[in-house]
C-alpha cells in the first residue's frame, strides 16, 4: 500500500515584511511551505518578501491586517487559509516598542505595546487554533524576547508583553496538545534589525559587550529556530522556550 503524500504546508507570519519576520518567511519557504506575509503599513516591503518567497518555488501572498483588531485577525487567518487551501503554521512576530522609563510612561504607551505584541498574538492564535484543531495538525510559534525573561530599564511595557507571550504559548500548548497542535516560543537576544539599528551607538556597543559570543545575532539565526519548531519532525516539542541570544541569558 502506498503511503499518503504529506501535503504542502502553509504558514502565516505576522509582521513578515522586514527583519525577523522576513527572515522567517524565507526560511519557511526554503522548507517548501507556502507563505502568507502579513504587514500593517509596509506594503512594498511585504510584496518584496512575498516575491522572494515565490523565487524559492512556493506560493506566497502579502496580506494587510492590523493585529490589534480581533476581527482583522480572524479575517487574516481566513484569507491565508483560503489562499492555500489550509493553514499549518502561525508565526506571531508582529511587534512594536514605545520605550520610556516607568514614571514617564503613559497608559497609552503601555497599551500600544500590549495591544500589538500580546493581544495581537492572542487574537491570531485563537483564530488559527480553530482551523488547526479541525485538521489535527498545527505549529504555533510566538516571537518573544530575552527582555521578557530578564527585564530591561525603560521597557516595562515591552517586557510585560514578551513575558506574556511565553505564558500564552504554554497555556495553548496544554489546551491543544491532544489535537496535534504544538505551541512554542522563541526568545531572541540582541539581533541586528531596523529596530536595533535605531539605538544609539553606545547602547549597541554595550549590548554586544554583554553577549558571550561578542556580537549581535542575525534575523536568520532566529528564523532557523522558527523553521525548526515549524517542521514535521518536531511534533513532540510543545510548550517550550528557545533562546537565540549568543549566551546572553546565561
Where are these regions (language model features)?
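The beta1-alpha1 cofactor-binding region of Rossmann-like NAD(H)/NADP(H)-dependent oxidoreductases
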Residues: 43, 64-76, 107, 220-221
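Short, small/polar-rich loop/turn modules that mediate ligand/substrate recognition or access, typified
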Residues: 86, 177, 182, 237-239
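Conserved glycine-rich cofactor-binding loop
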Residues: 10, 17-19
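Substrate-binding pocket helix/loop in short-chain dehydrogenase/reductase
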Residues: 101-102, 106-114, 196, 207
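Active-site helix of classical SDR
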Residues: 125, 161, 169
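Residue(s) in the substrate-gating loop at a strand-loop-helix junction
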Residues: 145
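Alpha-helical segment proximal to the catalytic Tyr-Lys
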Residues: 130, 174-178, 235
